[in-house]
């Protein structure tokens, strides 16, 4: 039996990442059972480090996220070193901006253990409107992103717009476009949970559910709130 290792982004209660942490293993198990496949699903957690000072407004704490990712990397390295990772195993990286991709590919190649790397891209320095895009110094992050793209066997994007922007801004050669897949995102169970509210009486309200940070342009939402009822969830 082969293993699908899930390398999750931090499960944050206020964000969809907690729902992904809970739901992706369930969805995978369902699909494995329906297709009568022979896979075991394992989630590799990182250390839930709580720093004294946190990054304001950002999706992740820019210090603590490296503790989380590095402890994930340590765990995976031990699995490779102890012979637990087998040829044909798969790694699902639920946020591709994770340096763990490099050691997984390194160990797979040098230990002669061919595995597949599946990476979900959310944002990065390749997007000039993202916080990484306007805060990181050129040009190192783009070289890193290209490396992780090519290290991954499959790269997933929620929309064609996102996929095309990634390929264009990083100048990915057309011969490597086959690694880029417009997949949508695994929100099935979230949608299922919301169907119970379909018949609930509704009012004309706009919900703005994003992080209250410059890269999300909250000033636009604040300005529009003068014209109609706007609920900014981070200010509730």
Predicted regions, residues:
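Conserved donor-binding/catalytic core segment of Leloir-type glycosyltransferases
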Residues: 183, 188-233
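Donor nucleotide-sugar binding/catalytic pocket of nucleotide-sugar-dependent glycosyltransferases
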Residues: 150-201
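Membrane-proximal helix-turn-helix segments that form the acceptor-binding/catalytic region
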Residues: 134-155
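Short, solvent-exposed loop/turn segments at secondary-structure junctions
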Residues: 9-14, 45-50, 96-100, 123-126, ...
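N-terminal pre-catalytic "stem/leader" segment of glycosyltransferase-like enzymes
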Residues: 1-103
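Short, well-ordered alpha-helix to beta-strand connector turns
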Residues: 87-89, 114, 151-154, 203, ...
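Active-site proximal beta-strand in glycosyltransferases
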Residues: 90-96, 109-131
């Amino acid at each position: 039996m082969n293993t699908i290792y899930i390398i999750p982004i931090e499960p944050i209660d206020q964000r969809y990442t907690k729902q992904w942490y809970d739901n992706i293993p369930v969805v995978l198990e369902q699909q494995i059972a329906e297709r009568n496949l022979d896979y075991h699903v394992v989630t590799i957690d990182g250390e839930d480090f709580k720093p004294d000072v946190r990054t304001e407004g950002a999706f992740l704490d820019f210090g603590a996220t490296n503790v989380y990712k590095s402890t994930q990397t340590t765990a995976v390295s031990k699995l490779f070193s102890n012979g637990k990772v087998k040829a044909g195993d798969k790694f699902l990286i639920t946020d591709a901006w994770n340096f763990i991709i490099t050691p997984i590919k390194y160990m797979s190649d040098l230990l002669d253990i061919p595995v597949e790397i599946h990476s979900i891209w959310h944002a990065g320095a390749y997007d000039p409107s993202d916080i990484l895009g306007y805060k990181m110094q050129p040009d190192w992050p783009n070289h890193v992103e290209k490396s992780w793209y090519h290290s991954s066997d499959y790269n997933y994007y929620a929309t064609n717009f996102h996929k095309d922007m990634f390929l264009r801004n990083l100048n990915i050669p057309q011969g490597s476009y086959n690694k880029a897949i417009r997949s949508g995102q695994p929100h099935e169970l979230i949608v299922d949970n919301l169907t119970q509210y379909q018949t609930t009486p509704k009012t004309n309200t706009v919900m703005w559910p994003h992080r209250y940070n410059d890269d999300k342009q909250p000033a636009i939402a604040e300005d529009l709130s003068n014209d109609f009822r706007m609920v900014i969830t981070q200010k509730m």
